[in-house]
Amino acid sequence: MPKRVLQGVVVSDKNDKTVVVKVERRYSHPLLKKTVRQSKKYKAHDESNQFKIGDQIFIQESKPISKDKRWIVVKDSVA
């Protein structure tokens, strides 16, 4: 099974080698019949501390790195 890749925005880089990424998804609400935006935050491993707040990045699923981290930063979405 391939590993999931998500795109999001860095909202926090205060932790060492960790960034918090906000991933937004859109779906059609079954009752209201309108598009709804929903976001979720993921902690991702950033080995070199190169990503800053506001950066658009891709994160990939990985084995557990710590209690909360199960994602690693793959690349910058601009590159």
UniProtKB/Swiss-Prot annotation:
Keywords noted in UniProt: Ribonucleoprotein, Ribosomal protein, RNA-binding, rRNA-binding
Any one GO CC term of the record: cytosolic small ribosomal subunit
Pfam families the record matches: Ribosomal_S17
Coiled coil ranges: none
Annotated GO MF terms: rRNA binding; structural constituent of ribosome
UniProt KW Ribosomal protein keyword: yes
InterPro entries (alphabetical): NA-bd_OB-fold (IPR012340), Ribosomal_uS17 (IPR000266), Ribosomal_uS17_bact/chlr (IPR019984), Ribosomal_uS17_CS (IPR019979)
GO biological process: translation
Similarity section: Belongs to the universal ribosomal protein uS17 family.
Job of this protein: One of the primary rRNA binding proteins, it binds specifically to the 5'-end of 16S ribosomal RNA.
HAMAP family named in the record: Ribosomal_uS17_B
Matches recorded under NCBIfam families: PRK05610.1, uS17_bact
Subunit organization: Part of the 30S ribosomal subunit.
Protein name, UniProt field: Small ribosomal subunit protein uS17
Originating organism: Bartonella henselae (strain ATCC 49882 / DSM 28221 / CCUG 30454 / Houston 1)
This protein's encoding gene: rpsQ
